[in-house]
């Protein structure tokens, strides 16, 4: 069982249904920034970091051999704020390491 480290990112893990749901919440934000649609948007790996909320680094498959790394912030539940895409990197491949950016 993985566990995020306070202040640091967890080890890279296989994406779960929860991580896919988080990625899905920021898909439209990425599509708007990139001015394109992603018919495939499958979370495959992730890392997490506990802060005043949760940061996620998520590797998302957007085509057969094309990946995007997204950084997402999820605020604390009582703040009632939407999940936010805070940064992203395009032109990634499956074997690219998921590191902070």
From Swiss-Prot:
Q: Of which family is this protein a member?
A: Belongs to the cystatin family.
Q: Where is this motif: Secondary area of contact?
A: 49-53
Which protein are we looking at?
Stefin-C
GO MF annotation terms: cysteine-type endopeptidase inhibitor activity
Q: Which InterPro entries match?
A: Cystatin_dom (IPR000010), Cystatin_sf (IPR046350), Prot_inh_cystat_CS (IPR018073), Prot_inh_stefin (IPR001713)
Domain of life, source organism: Eukaryota
Q: Which organism is it from?
A: Bos taurus
Q: Which Pfam families match?
A: Cystatin
Q: Which UniProt keywords apply?
A: Acetylation, Cytoplasm, Protease inhibitor, Thiol protease inhibitor
């Amino acid at each position: 069982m993985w566990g995020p480290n306070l202040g640091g990112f967890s080890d890279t893990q296989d994406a779960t249904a929860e991580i896919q749901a988080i990625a899905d919440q920021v898909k439209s934000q990425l599509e708007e920034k990139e001015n394109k649609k992603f018919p495939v948007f499958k979370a495959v790996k992730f890392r997490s970091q506990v802060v005043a909320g949760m940061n996620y680094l998520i590797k998302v498959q957007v085509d057969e051999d094309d990946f995007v790394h997204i950084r997402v912030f999820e605020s604390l539940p009582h703040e009632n704020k939407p999940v936010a895409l805070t940064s992203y990197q395009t032109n990634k491949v499956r074997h690219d390491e998921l590191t902070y950016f």
